[in-house]
């Protein structure tokens, strides 16, 4: 297994994480006007934690996985988009998708300017591993299924 950081695009790896006042302030929650939050407590006046710390800690405990190895997203579309955006250089890399499958793989590849190579399932819906290997030898960066 490769070290995953070696697969990440260089410009993505060098990004500085977005920081909010909430990240920097550890005391009693005040009013975060820089985040355009409502100063009046009505139950919906705060944005949720952008790092999902509490949720990841709970999932970590339940599943026995380190919280830094857990990704939480806004559904599969976001996860697919991020995988292609993080690991594939636009107009350079390609990805492999098994077909028939979820249509968002193709849409996300087009949005990220990544060539998508589709490999058809066998007639019995088995994975054509030899075809996947052959297509993957020509510079595929990601296999999505």
Where are these regions (language model features)?
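Short beta->alpha linker loops
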Residues: 50, 71-75, 100
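Short glycine-rich anion-binding loops that position phosphate/pyrophosphate groups of nucleotides
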Residues: 36-39, 76, 102
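Phosphate-binding glycine-rich loop
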Residues: 56-94, 112
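Hydrophobic residues at beta-strand termini and immediately following loops
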Residues: 33, 47, 73, 117-119
